[in-house]
A protein has these predicted regions:
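Short, conserved catalytic or interaction motifs in soluble domains
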Residues: 43, 68-69
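DNA major-groove recognition helix of helix-turn-helix/homeodomain DNA-binding modules
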Residues: 51-66
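Recognition helix of helix-turn-helix/homeodomain-like DNA-binding domains
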Residues: 32-46
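Helix-turn-helix/homeodomain-like alpha-helical modules used for DNA recognition
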Residues: 71-75
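A detector for short, charged/polar N-terminal pre-domain segments
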Residues: 1-8
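Short basic helix-loop element that most often maps to the first helix and adjoining turn
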Residues: 11-26, 30
């Protein structure tokens, strides 16, 4: 498995968790999810529950939202 790109969700969570001084266990407790979920999220596991991802992001004042994807015919 390759390292996550700097703009990825996994990188965001790992970076913010470390900056806050949280262990994976502490972040999981704050978000109401298990340490294993935090580990899976930080490793970009492709099958994560969005409701649980949003619980983790809420600790950092964020949420997943919809944005328009660029179209192939746009410059």
């Amino acid at each position: 498995m390759s390292a996550p790109q700097p703009s990825s969700l996994a990188h965001f969570v790992r970076t913010r968790r470390r900056a806050a001084g949280f262990s994976q266990t502490v972040l999981g407790e704050l978000a109401g999810v298990g340490r294993r979920f935090i580990s899976d999220l930080e490793q970009s596991k492709p099958t994560l529950r969005l409701d649980a991802v949003n619980k983790v992001l809420a600790v950092f004042g964020k949420t997943i939202g919809l944005v328009d994807a660029p179209r192939d015919d746009e410059p």
